[in-house]
Amino acid sequence: MPPKRPDADRFAYADAARLLRETLDALLPPTRISVAEHAARHRWVRASSGAHLERYDHTTAPYLRGPMEALTEHGIETVAIVGPAASGKTAGPAESWLLQTVHADPADVLWFMHTSDAVEAYVKSRIEPMLEAHAKLIGDLRYGRDSVAMKRFRGGRVEFLPFTASSLINKHVQRIIADEYDAYDPALGDPIQLLNPRRQAAGADSRLLAISHPDLGVPITMPPERQRGIMRLYANSDRRTWWWPCPHCGAFSSPNPGTARRMLLDYPEDAPLDAVEQEARLLCPVNGCVIEDGHRHAMNVAGRWVCAGESIDEDGHVTGAPVFSRTAGFW
């Protein structure tokens, strides 16, 4: 009885044609394309209404383009994104970076979340559907059988892990995603001090993306050493803030605390919560214009990030030089 042919799905190099193709591909340099550009060209996402897929559109959440660009920006080793829940900071930059890594710039990746349950839920609900939706793009790059915790691709692998002491042992990669950074067990110590050695061997080619709601932060006016969690990373970064124009007078201001011209919410303080939600408005700090929520999308499309060390005038002109930091911080 002749021996059975090896299962190509289990043994990546059982197929001679595949072996030859991948050997030749390995000699080619990685495609130089930013995460933002890759998402615009190649990524598909589920439509907000209906079950069909549509092209990733940067105008949906324009403020996420900056963090995506920073992931391939020369001289940047860490990207810290501070923001509220459900603002797209994981679905946008993190997932797009994963897809760009697999398709265009292979490397080993560690993706940490705060618990095993969170890892399993996220991989099953977000990562696996994303990979399946891009089968035509990356199908030939996937290797055999994988699991919730491990996805193998040509030129690299992605491990999805809870942030625990055992998960950090003997892990050395080029890229790390630290999701829900402020939810990590504080008994383990400062997360960045535990994560940096995991990418030390990659040197300046390493990248770490940290994402979180600022649950551990103290007021931004406090010195960096007093900050904790994601806000400590931000305080030691180039501290980029988001600026957008008033839809009525055109003057640029920022919703971020501590900025020179801060746009605030105006609402009836003693009213019931339902009334507050209905009546809350933004106030332009330059001319006092009342801004309805319906203008926010157009304001974001026209918005931009401004680094510490730079100044932006009311007309949107930026002057000055950004402070030097190998961490790009977005808040």
List PLM regions with ranges.
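Phosphate/NTP-binding elements of NTP-utilizing enzymes
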Residues: 2-331
